[in-house]
Amino acid sequence: MLFRSLDHISGGRAGWNVVTTGSSEAAGNFGLEAHPIHAERYIRAHEFIDVVKGLWDSWEDDAFVRDQETAFYYDPNKIHQLNHKGRFFSVRGPLNIARPPQGYPVIVQAGSSQDGKELAGRTAEVIFTAQQTLEDAQAFYTDVKSRLAKYGRTPEQLKVMPGVFPVVGLTEGDAKADRKSTRLNSSHQIISYAV
């Protein structure tokens, strides 16, 4: 798996942004005539993440001995086949590369729908969000954090990363004027800050 190789090369600094796009162009890139409906994309994402994590776990942490003197490269007793047969995927495994340095790369999910928040609550270390108001952001935070307990996770195991578009001015008035100008050319609401 190329991604796992990148994680090794970077010393465990790679992250995986799990995207369940609704783009019809993306569907065509994967041999699909039409894109699956929203809910089905998230069901598929849950299974896909399970498969990928299972493949990452196919080698135990200490499976690779790499002893040149004895020519003992790896311990075959510490390799496991995945043998996953699910609704969308059938994968035997194992991978042909060691576990990532930190176990798994950081998993990021960016979805504000109920399905997206559920996927993040079950699988992600980070969720990206772009709420329009402070009140919406606080409600999102509380909602997504409350989903972790049913998966045996604590609120500390999921970081919420808000999308912020700062507009800076010498005064608050300058920032608001810049914000107004920018809003005319953007479909995103922007919060003003003065320095």
Residue ranges and their predicted role:
Residues 1-2, 180, 184-195:
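Single conserved hydrophobic/aromatic residue that forms the stacking wall/gate
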Residues 115, 134-135, 190:
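Glycine-rich nucleotide phosphate-binding loop and flanking beta-alpha elements
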Residues 119-146, 150-153, 158-179:
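Glycine-rich, aromatic-lined ligand/substrate-binding cores of catalytic
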Residues 3, 42-45, 49, 137, ...:
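Amphipathic alpha-helical segments in well-structured domains
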Residues 8-123, 151, 155-156, 165, ...:
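Internal, glycine-rich beta/alpha segment that forms the wall or movable "lid"
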Residues 5-9, 134:
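Gly/lys/ser-thr-rich phosphate-binding loops in alpha/beta enzymes
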Residues 112, 132, 187:
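Flexible loop residues that form catalytic
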